[in-house]
């Protein structure tokens, strides 16, 4: 079995560990402004997912959810960060939920930023996947990279109620798609806080970094 290289990551600050996971076609740098606000009180680890940022990816067939979760575990092990609060935007939030389900001993809390749990309805799932395929073709992405953002099952939706750790939900005021997801989280998760950042859309952690950082500090500080 070929060993996958450890994902590139940034590691700043000291204190309780926050583990940041970005969204599709972003990279660790999207968290810079949030981490600038938090690194005085938290250890902030931010990864580049496979095929994103400084990570070259590993070729077609290597972007599935289980493999990427293994990549995140490898960073956790290398940094010896212990159990973490996972802070995920969009795709990163979905991966954070999956980690909390499959490896609950690694996760002490969830910061879900403009995130969703996937789809239980197969037709909705396929509509999402079609939109990802279209975007991948428009961007001329490396073969197979789109798989990282596609949904093949309803695992997270079906098992979300197993998650016991506290979650804080953060969404931009104009992010209507993921505002609906925030309602789903309140139904199934132990939501300790919900923050709507004014005048922000899906990239709320970039456009509204102070509000995102304040919500994370209030929930996990």
What are these regions (language model features)?
Residues 23-33, 44:
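Serine-hydrolase catalytic-loop signature spanning alpha/beta hydrolases and amidase-signature enzymes
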Residues 15, 23-26, 90:
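Active-site glycine-rich loops that stabilize anionic/oxyanionic intermediates
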Residues 163, 169-171:
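Short beta-strand/loop motif that positions the catalytic acidic residue
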Residues 94-102, 107-136:
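Flexible "cap/lid" loop of the alpha/beta hydrolase fold
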Residues 133-158, 173-174, 192:
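Hydrophobic, aromatic-rich cap/lid helix
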Residues 7-12, 36, 45-85, 214:
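Active-site loop/oxyanion-hole signature of alpha/beta-hydrolase fold enzymes
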């Amino acid at each position: 079995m070929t060993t996958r290289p450890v994902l590139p990551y940034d590691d700043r600050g000291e204190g309780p560990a926050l583990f940041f996971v970005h969204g599709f076609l972003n990279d660790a740098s999207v968290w810079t402004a949030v981490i600038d606000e938090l690194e005085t009180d938290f250890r902030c680890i931010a990864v580049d997912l496979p095929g994103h940022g400084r990570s070259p990816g590993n070729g077609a067939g290597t972007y599935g959810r289980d493999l990427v979760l293994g990549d995140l575990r490898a960073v956790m092990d290398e940094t010896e960060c212990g159990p973490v609060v996972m802070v995920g935007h969009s795709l990163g939030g979905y991966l954070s939920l999956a980690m909390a389900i499959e490896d609950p001993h690694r996760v002490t809390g969830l910061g879900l930023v403009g995130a969703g749990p996937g789809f239980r309805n197969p037709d909705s799932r396929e509509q999402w996947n079609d939109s990802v395929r279209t975007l991948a073709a428009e961007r001329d992405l490396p073969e197979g990279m789109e798989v990282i953002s596609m949904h093949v099952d309803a695992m997270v939706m079906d098992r979300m109620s197993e998650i016991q750790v506290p979650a804080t939900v953060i969404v931009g005021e104009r992010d209507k798609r993921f505002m609906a997801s925030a309602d789903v989280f309140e139904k199934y998760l132990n939501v300790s806080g919900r923050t709507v950042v004014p005048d922000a859309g899906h990239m709320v952690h970039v456009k509204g970094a102070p509000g995102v950082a304040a919500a994370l500090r209030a929930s996990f500080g």
